[in-house]
């Protein structure tokens, strides 16, 4: 569908296209879900056509803000004052043809962290891109259920906190 719609860009003149882009989906989207397409391809196709990108799922449903202790420590060692979520937002915001990065915020702390991250945005360096690619590869080595904590499964009739169980 994506390629078909882009093939009609000359006729339809898209103002922007919304894509899912984060440091896991950049090169590993199919490993997360076989129906997905790598964000690197999606973004490159938009750049070819000079179409701005609106980014959704920069935190991969919140998973990139809840890394395991080992992965979190690797990012914190590099930038101790920044949140783990800020790495994902910086990754998404670094690309020049990104119009905006969407962020689902629940708490005031999320908004404050986003403001610190984007005002002003400090783009990721090549070294940081490499670290995030390594983080993505390591994440995929851990057996997980791809739960994005949407809570559609809640409330559980048996009183179980299903998203919390799947997280661990």
Question: Where in this protein do the model-derived segments appear?
Answer:
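Beta/alpha (TIM)-barrel catalytic core signal, keyed to glycine-rich beta->alpha loops juxtaposed to Asp/Glu
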Residues: 1-160, 164
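Short, intrinsically disordered, charge-balanced linker/junction segments flanking boundaries
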Residues: 166-168
